[in-house]
A protein has these predicted regions:
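Active-site loop-to-helix junction immediately N-terminal to the catalytic Tyr of the SDR YXXXK motif
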Residues: 1, 6, 53-61, 73, ...
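Substrate-binding pocket helix/loop in short-chain dehydrogenase/reductase
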Residues: 1-3, 7-12, 98, 109
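Active-site loop immediately N-terminal to the catalytic Tyr-X3-Lys motif
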Residues: 4, 52-58, 80-81, 116, ...
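Active-site helix of classical SDR
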Residues: 26, 63, 71
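Residue(s) in the substrate-gating loop at a strand-loop-helix junction
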Residues: 47
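Short, small/polar-rich loop/turn modules that mediate ligand/substrate recognition or access, typified
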Residues: 79, 84, 139-141
């Protein structure tokens, strides 16, 4: 949709799913983790849209930018309390979400990815395992792009 045509009910739905539910998950997780002697790790999912505006998807772009900033805000509030929160930001992924893209558009996007391919859901495993492990204990409030180098080009 163009911004002037974006339906209000669609906006509300995307906000609920992509932002409100993330916030409530963080809140509930903190309520449990703050009672644990070991604290915990929270991993949010942003998008490359957390870094820049995307055409025809204003609600999606707004929510992913908000998730990135929410992650940073909570990281500041939880620093020193034994809880780390970081955000993984996938680039173009071969998932259902992009299934309706034309092949021409997919090819156009692929040309901008230095890795020369779209990500696969399996490409998210490494960052998730790292962020959930003790190896990331000093990492807090970070946005981790998983995008085949898209953002550096």
């Amino acid at each position: 949709y163009l911004p002037e045509e974006f339906p209000a009910e669609q906006w509300d739905l995307v906000m609920k799913i992509n932002l409100d539910h993330v916030w409530f998950m963080i809140q509930r997780s903190l309520q449990v983790m703050l009672k644990q002697p070991t604290g915990g790790k929270i991993i949010t999912i942003g998008s490359m849209a957390s870094y820049f505006g995307c055409t025809t998807v204003p609600a999606y772009t707004a929510t992913k930018g908000a998730v990135a900033q929410l992650t940073k805000s909570v990281a500041v509030d939880c620093a020193g309390r034994g809880i780390n929160i970081n955000c993984i930001c996938p680039g173009y992924m071969d998932t259902e979400m992009c299934a309706n893209m034309t092949q021409e558009r997919k090819d156009e996007c692929t040309k901008r990815i230095p890795a020369g391919r779209w990500g696969l859901p399996e490409d998210m495993k490494g960052p998730v395992v790292f962020l959930a492990s003790a190896a990331s204990d000093y990492l807090n409030g970070a946005l981790i792009p998983v995008d085949g180098g898209y953002l550096v080009k």
